[in-house]
Design a protein with these regions (language model features):
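Nucleotide/pyrophosphate-binding catalytic subdomain
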Residues: 1-216, 307, 383-384
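Short phosphate-binding/catalytic loops that engage adenosine nucleotides
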Residues: 34, 90, 224, 287, ...
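Conserved H-loop
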Residues: 41, 231, 294
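Short hydrophobic alpha-helical runs that function as membrane-insertion/retention elements
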Residues: 168-172, 226-228, 290
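Acidic-aromatic/histidine active-site loop/patch
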Residues: 219
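Active-site C-terminal subdomain of aminotransferase-like
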Residues: 224-235, 258
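A conserved regulatory-domain signal marking ACT and ACT-like small-molecule sensing domains
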Residues: 237-402
């Protein structure tokens, strides 16, 4: 007997027919002799609809009250799915985040999991029940309900799998695995049978919407085997697991991130501590920095460029203009019409010529590179946003079809 945690997203439980489909998947897993815990998200656009309803009453509601409201979406899904499974004749119980003892900090709307008590889950499983859990939610030390922010249901599923020592955590989505590129851009993108935690983390951080990076980080930390599968087909999915015994591809995937902006601070004093002033200011205002480039000019001056999320561009411009005298720069430029395109591969660390092939593909496609960033398993380039789709296609062709 195996213990399997299955997570179903909003599209998978969006309506009655899809709930029946999920009930069929879950009960077939149980019929195969497995203990099953299911984590569900809110149906379809439920969360967005609740946010709209709140805004109609108050355009600045407290995060605490928003968490109370948004918790209801997952509770609707869990109870409806439990009813569908009851109809099929299986013993089942639905539980909220606080009923399973999922304890969080008090950072409303983006809480972090501290622990899951686990006793209630184990008791229900030992009694032969399928357990349905509302994802995305927990409870803080004051007894207030909280929500876990983006990717919260994925994170709930992995946390439960880690707590119970599950044999597998399956993430059901509207795609049947992890591909070498976005199939909507690259028609001949190939599905990967397996990928390492580190590769999946990089792809998730680059905007691949299959898994949220918080859940992958937790899976890696607690060595939880993941599988990405489709709710709508019975095709095999992609396994995400420790890569030590896997044959490592030089490049496993190509990804793009259009939520980028390039900040250039021009003609700063070329003296010790200048970079510290810039980036401590960004840290103070909780701005995430990605690629950094420093270039030395004339007359003891230098320029510093870095990339941020496009969502932060206006705020960062205001922060830097207010700090112009303190930083002592001559000019400031912010470009929001850029994109980051990256290749990821665990085998890259021991391979030669990977960067050369990537840059050749971009050159042949007539695409100019503005910034470059590398790590042991990733190479990223910043390019014009209008070239991002063409870049993904060209790089994918070079590495997977040449």
């Amino acid at each position: 007997m195996s213990l399997i945690v299955q997570k179903f997203g909003g599209t998978s439980v969006a309506n009655t027919e899809r709930l029946k489909n999920v009930a069929d998947i879950v009960t077939k897993t149980a019929q195969a002799g497995n203990q099953v815990v299911v984590v569900v998200s809110a149906q379809g656009d439920t969360t967005d609809d609740l946010i709209v309803k709140a805004a109609e009453l108050n355009d600045r509601p407290s995060k605490r009250e928003m968490d109370v409201l948004l918790n209801t979406g997952e509770m609707i899904s869990m109870s409806l799915l439990a009813m569908a499974i009851q109809k099929l004749g299986f013993p089942v119980v639905s539980l909220t985040g606080w009923q399973i003892g999922l304890e969080t900090n008090s950072n409303y709307s983006d809480a972090r999991i501290k622990r899951i008590a686990g006793e209630r889950l184990k008791a229900e499983l030992d009694n032969g029940r399928i357990v349905i859990v509302a994802g995305f939610q927990g409870i803080n030390q004051m007894g207030d309900v909280t929500t876990l922010g983006r990717g919260g249901s994925d994170t709930t599923a992995v946390a439960i799998a880690a707590t119970l020592g599950a044999d597998l955590c399956q993430i059901y989505t509207d795609v049947d695995g992890v591909y070498t590129a976005d199939p909507r851009i690259v028609k001949d993108a190939k599905k990967l049978d397996a990928i390492t935690y580190d590769e999946m983390l990089e792809l998730a951080s680059l905007g691949a919407q299959v898994l949220h990076n918080r859940s992958v980080e937790m899976a890696k930390k607690y060595n939880v085997d993941l599988e990405v599968v489709s709710s709508f087909t019975r095709n095999s999915g992609t396994k995400v697991k420790e890569g030590s015994n896997m044959e490592k591809l030089n490049v496993s995937g190509v990804a793009r991130d259009n939520n980028c902006a390039r900040v250039a601070i021009i003609n700063l004093d070329d003296t010790p501590g200048t970079a510290f002033k810039v980036f401590s200011l960004m840290a103070k205002h909780h701005v995430n920095i990605d690629i950094i480039l420093q270039s030395v000019g004339r007359d003891n001056k230098k320029s510093i460029s870095f990339t941020i999320r496009q969502d932060d561009a206006e705020r960062v411009e205001s922060i830097l203009r207010d700090a112009k005298e303190m930083l002592g720069y001559e000019d400031l430029s912010i470009n929001t019409k850029v994109a980051k395109v990256s290749i990821v591969g665990a085998g890259m660390a021991s391979a030669t010529g990977v960067a050369s092939k990537m840059f050749e593909a971009l050159a042949m496609a007539g695409i100019n590179i503005r910034m470059i960033s590398t790590s042991e398993i990733k190479i990223s380039v910043l390019i014009n946003e209008e070239d991002s789709e063409k870049a993904v296609k060209a790089i994918h062709e070079e590495f997977f079809n040449a």
